[in-house]
Design a protein with these regions (language model features):
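Catalytic metal-binding acidic patch
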Residues: 86-119, 129
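N-terminal regions immediately upstream of nucleotidyltransferase
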Residues: 1-75, 79-83, 101
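A general structural signal for short secondary-structure junctions and capping/turn motifs
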Residues: 79, 127-128
């Protein structure tokens, strides 16, 4: 496995449908189930564990980016630096090593002065992931 598309060939279609959907959760759950099945098949066919855990982290990166992009994080549309909030992967996932039953550890880093500005989006984002 060398690319994310080879791991999950429907990512472009998933990106489009998730961005347009009012209810993305069923689409995301189906994509995760398809990805798990694909990984089981790849493992059975001899794909190295190192490749599988790296591909899993890359796939989750893509899913999280789709979820994150559903929200408007911009605070200052006239500035070059529009937002002062970041989603950061930490732990094994942050190292690009995501085992099948590992937690997905995330940190939302935000400038203290802007914390209230994003509270509703953060709550909705976390609810979507939960």
């Amino acid at each position: 496995m060398t690319s994310l598309e080879s791991v999950s060939p429907n990512l472009a279609a998933l990106s489009q449908t998730v961005s347009e959907s009012k209810t993305p959760l069923p689409l995301l759950k189906a994509a995760l189930a398809d990805f798990r099945a694909h990984q089981h098949t790849a493992f059975d066919n001899g794909t190295s564990v190192a490749e599988l855990i790296t591909a899993r982290a890359a796939f989750i990166d893509h899913i999280l980016a789709l979820c994150w992009q559903r929200f408007n994080w911009d605070e200052n549309l006239s500035s070059l630096r529009k937002s002062r909030i970041s989603l950061v992967a930490v732990g094994g996932y942050g190292r690009g090593e995501l085992l099948p039953n590992s937690d997905i550890d995330l940190l939302i880093l935000i400038e203290r002065a802007n914390a209230q500005h994003h509270s509703s989006n953060i709550q909705s984002f976390l609810a979507l992931l939960w």
